[in-house]
Regions:
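Phosphate/ribose-recognition catalytic cores of enzymes acting on nucleotide-derived substrates
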Residues: 180-300
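N-terminal Rossmann-like or analogous alpha/beta NTP/dinucleotide-binding catalytic cores
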Residues: 43-129
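Glycine-rich, Lys/Arg-enriched anion-binding loops that position phosphate/diphosphate groups
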Residues: 126-226
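A structural preference for short, hydrophobic beta-strand core positions in alpha/beta folds
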Residues: 36, 75, 135-136
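N-terminal catalytic cores of NTP/NDP-binding nucleotidyl/phosphoryl-transfer enzymes
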Residues: 2-58
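Residue-level signal for inorganic ion chemistry
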Residues: 15, 65, 103, 163, ...
Length: 300
């Protein structure tokens, strides 16, 4: 069994605070021995009886963790067994079954039954076992702690720029392009259509400036996230108009990188008025996006 230094946490958003943990792992472990232990479902589902809307799908979270250099991702179910496992047994299990050879956590990290495990006890455990470890202080931006909760609020407010600043990377959303009403094509604005994943925190409805990588090339995308009130106004959809791209994306997986909030979603009096607004958004994005480069690059 290979050995790994593991960062511990849920890592929703993989924000700058999480990246500080990943950086600590990279200082302790050589490439090939860097890992993360996280959970398939949010602990609050059992601990508090409620599930917060998440920033990332599990697939996008894994994509980000790998982007930041993690070689192994252990995603455990947070179930009754996990919830009632004593903190020491939890660490021992990682040593025995997952090749753990050291740990990294944040200074406020709690784990084990009743949250009895903490950073101090983890440090004592590692000293006792002769294992390397690191306890990472919280990260702040603008004098306030960076947290997934803070980022969810920023997304809800439509403050994409500040959310991106807290994450240290764009807000990403991956989906498979499906057939839509093809209204955009009749307007000369062909859009791809993606379903908004269930269980995610919903950013403010509106039009966003995004980047996306297709066949190794980065494109700008004017993206409507909302219910399309001018057309039908029911289901949440994600519709990027990928500028200067003319290929067929049906059935393909696309990762959108949200960079900036262009305007709130609104109902227009006519499709002509809608088209004019979208074209204005495209010009706005071309100006703002001159310095944007693709974040993730080609999807593996």
């Amino acid at each position: 069994m290979n050995s790994y230094i593991y960062a511990l946490g849920f890592f929703d958003g993989v924000h700058l605070g999480h990246q500080a943990l990943l950086d600590a792992v990279k200082k302790l472990a050589l490439p090939g021995a860097r890992g993360v232990v996280t959970f398939l479902n949010h602990p609050d589902t059992l601990v508090l009886g409620q599930t917060p809307g998440l920033i990332n799908t599990p697939q996008d979270r894994e994509l980000l963790l790998k982007h930041y250099g993690m070689d192994k991702i252990v995603a455990l179910p947070f179930d009754k067994k996990t919830q009632t496992t004593p903190w020491r047994d939890f660490l021992e299990d990682l040593l025995e079954h997952h090749g753990a050879a050291g740990f990294v956590c944040g200074e406020d990290f709690r784990f084990g039954a009743r949250g009895a495990g903490n950073a101090r006890l983890l440090a004592e455990f590692c000293r006792e076992k002769g294992l390397p470890f690191a306890i990472v202080p919280e990260q702040t931006l603008g004098g306030s702690r960076i947290s997934s909760t803070r980022i969810r609020k920023l997304l809800d407010d439509g403050d994409m720029e500040q959310a991106v600043a807290c994450m240290g990377h764009p807000y990403i959303l991956t989906g498979t392009v499906v057939h839509g009403h093809q209204l955009g094509r009749t307007l000369g604005i062909p859009t791809a259509n993606l379903a908004f994943p269930k269980g995610l925190a919903t950013p403010r409805f509106g039009v966003y400036g995004c980047t996306t990588c297709i066949d190794g090339k980065t494109y700008l995308a004017v993206t409507n996230l909302g219910t399309r009130p001018t057309v039908d106004g029911h289901h949440i959809t994600v519709e990027p108009w990928i500028l200067d791209y003319s290929g067929d994306l049906y059935g393909q997986t696309v990762t959108l990188e949200f960079r900036t909030f262009l305007r709130p979603e609104r109902k227009f009096e006519s499709l002509t008025e809608l088209k004019t607004a979208i074209q204005a958004n495209a010009q706005q994005l071309r100006e703002q996006g001159k310095d944007f480069s693709g974040f993730l690059g080609a999807r593996p």
